[in-house]
A protein has these predicted regions:
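Sec-dependent bacterial lipoprotein signal peptides
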Residues: 1-22
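Short, well-ordered beta-strand elements
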Residues: 48-61, 79-84, 183-188
Length: 326
C-alpha cells in the first residue's frame, strides 16, 4: 500500500462548508405575515410548540439530510436548532446518546458494525435495517425510522469514456480484469478500505479473487477522484455511491452484481421516549425522503460539493420543488 498526495481541484463548497457550525431555526422563508406555513407539510402536520435539536455529521450528505429535517419540522411549526459538522462516524450518534440532540441521521451499515459490534453483514438491505432497528432499540433505546430509498455504500468507479475500451461494468468483470491484468489494475483507496472487514476483503471473499495491495494508492477522496480521472496513478477508484463527484467527474459506477458491499441505508435515529412522544416525526421524515434514490441524492450532494451551494439552500429548494413547502 502506497500513500500519495497531489494538488487537487479546489471547490467552492469548501469555503461554504467551513462557515457552517451551529444554526438556530425559526425562519425558513416558508411562513407568511401571520405565521402560517405553506405547502403540504403545513397542511398535514402540526408540530407547534415542539422544540427539536438536530445533529449532523461533517460531510455534504449529512448536512443536506439534517437541513431537510430542520426545514420540514419548521414548516410544521416546530422550533429547531441544528448542530452541524460533528465528526464522523459517531459524532452525531454520541450527541444523541448524551441527550444533546433529539434527531440524527445515521446509516445502517455504520450502526451494524460500529455501534452494535457485528462482524458479518446481512445481505438484504431491508433485513439489515430491521435487525439494526430491533437491536439498537433493545440495547440502547434508540428508535430508527423507516429508511430512505438511497444506499450510500462503497463502490468502484472509473471514467465513462473508458467503459467501452475496458469492458468493466460489474464487479464480476472487475475481478476478471484484475486477474487477467496483473500489475496493471491499480486502485486508489482511502486509509481503511483495503483492510476493513466491510471493504475490499469482503469483496475479495464474495467475488473469489485477490487484489495485490502493492497496486493500491492511499489518499483522501478529493485526490482519489482527480487521480482516477487522470488515470494516474490509478485506473480504478474506491467511491461512495452517492458522492456528487461521480456525476461531476463523469465516472462510471461499477455494478456490485453479487451484493458484496454491506448496505448503508439512511434513517433518522431518535431516542425511544422522544419518538413515542412525537409520532408525527417518523411519518414526516419518511414522507420527505420517499423519492430520494441514489441518483437524486447524488445530484443533491453535487450541488454542495461541486457547485458550492449551501446545504440549507439545497434542502429548502428540494422540499419546495416537491411541494412540501411553499
Amino acid at each position: 500500500m502506497r500513500r500519495f498526495t497531489r494538488m487537487t481541484r479546489t471547490l467552492a463548497a469548501g469555503a461554504a462548508l467551513s462557515m457552517l457550525a451551529v444554526a438556530c431555526g425559526g425562519d425558513n422563508g416558508t411562513t407568511d405575515a401571520d405565521g402560517d406555513a405553506a405547502g403540504s407539510i403545513a397542511e398535514d402536520y402540526d408540530l407547534d410548540g415542539l422544540e427539536v435539536r438536530v445533529a449532523s455529521k461533517d460531510f455534504a450528505e449529512q448536512l443536506i439530510l439534517g437541513q431537510l429535517a430542520k426545514v420540514a419540522m419548521e414548516a410544521a411549526g416546530a422550533e429547531v436548532e441544528i448542530t452541524e459538522n460533528l465528526p464522523s462516524p459517531d459524532g452525531a450518534r454520541n450527541a444523541l446518546l448524551a441527550g444533546d440532540a433529539d434527531v440524527a441521521w445515521e446509516y445502517t451499515g455504520t450502526a451494524w458494525t460500529n455501534y452494535l459490534g457485528n462482524d458479518e453483514p446481512i445481505d438484504d438491505p431491508i433485513e439489515q435495517w430491521e435487525a439494526v432497528a430491533r437491536d439498537d432499540l433493545a440495547e440502547n433505546g434508540v428508535f430508527w425510522t423507516e429508511p430512505a430509498p438511497f444506499d450510500n455504500t462503497y463502490g468502484f468507479a472509473y471514467p465513462n469514456d473508458l467503459v467501452d475500451e475496458r469492458g468493466v461494468e460489474t464487479v464480476t468483470d472487475l475481478a476478471e480484469f484484475v486477474e487477467a491484468n496483473p500489475g496493471e489494475a491499480t486502485l486508489c483507496v482511502d486509509s481503511t478500505f483495503a483492510s476493513r472487514d466491510d471493504g475490499l476483503p469482503r469483496i475479495e471473499e464474495v467475488y473469489d479473487f485477490e487484489w495485490d495491495r502493492d497496486l493500491m494508492f492511499e489518499s483522501d477522496f478529493g485526490v482519489i477522484y482527480t487521480s482516477v480521472v487522470d488515470q494516474d496513478p490509478c485506473i480504478f477508484a474506491e467511491v461512495f455511491t452517492t458522492d456528487g463527484s461521480i456525476v461531476a467527474e463523469d465516472l462510471f459506477l461499477i455494478e456490485d452484481d453479487q451484493n458484496g458491499f454491506i448496505s448503508y441505508l439512511s434513517s433518522v435515529q431518535m431516542m425511544e421516549d422522544f419518538a413515542n412522544d412525537n409520532p408525527q416525526l417518523a411519518e414526516l421524515f419518511q414522507e420527505i425522503t420517499a423519492d430520494i434514490d441514489e441518483a437524486t441524492m447524488t445530484a443533491l450532494n453535487a450541488e454542495v460539493d461541486v457547485d458550492g451551494e449551501f446545504p440549507e439552500d439545497v434542502a429548502e429548494n428540494y422540499l419546495r420543488e416537491q411541494g412540501f413547502i411553499g
